A protein has these predicted regions:
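Alpha-helical segment proximal to the catalytic Tyr-Lys
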Residues: 29-33
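Active-site helix of classical SDR
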Residues: 16
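Short, flexible, mixed-charge acidic loops at enzyme active sites
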Residues: 51-60, 110-112
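Active-site loop immediately N-terminal to the catalytic Tyr-X3-Lys motif
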Residues: 5-11
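C-terminal helical subdomain
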Residues: 40-41, 60-106
Length: 112
């Protein structure tokens, strides 16, 4: 989601994700004459090793990121990829934003 909206202390990360978003849009235009569809998936909070790396291996701090709500997992994203690649040839999914039900924006969560 960082490529769709900026957030505090995410300057470089959000900027690079926004660059990927525009690269994807440009590739979509460049590859259109060849019949190649280009899709982008923008996931919200997904429980991956990202938080562990972000907190330099501190597993307690990394786990705290996901406390109080159910984050996305790899299967959720894989299901989205499967949905995109199984569309009929006349259908192109350009952008798919996937968020946990408890997440309304990059920084707004409903936690238990």
């Amino acid at each position: 989601i960082a490529g769709k909206e900026a957030y505090l202390q995410g300057t470089v990360y959000c900027a690079t994700k926004a660059a990927v978003d525009h690269l994807t849009k440009a590739m979509r235009m460049d590859l259109l004459p060849f019949g190649i569809c280009v899709s982008a998936i923008a996931p919200g909070a997904a429980e991956t090793e990202f938080s562990l790396v972000r907190f330099k291996g501190d597993s307690d701090q990394a786990s705290a990121v996901y406390q109080g709500f159910t984050p996305l997992d790899a299967k959720d994203i894989a299901d989205a990829v499967h949905f995109i690649v199984t569309r009929p040839p006349h259908v192109s999914i350009h952008d798919l934003v996937i968020m946990p039900a408890a997440q309304a924006s990059a920084t707004l969560f409903k936690k238990d």
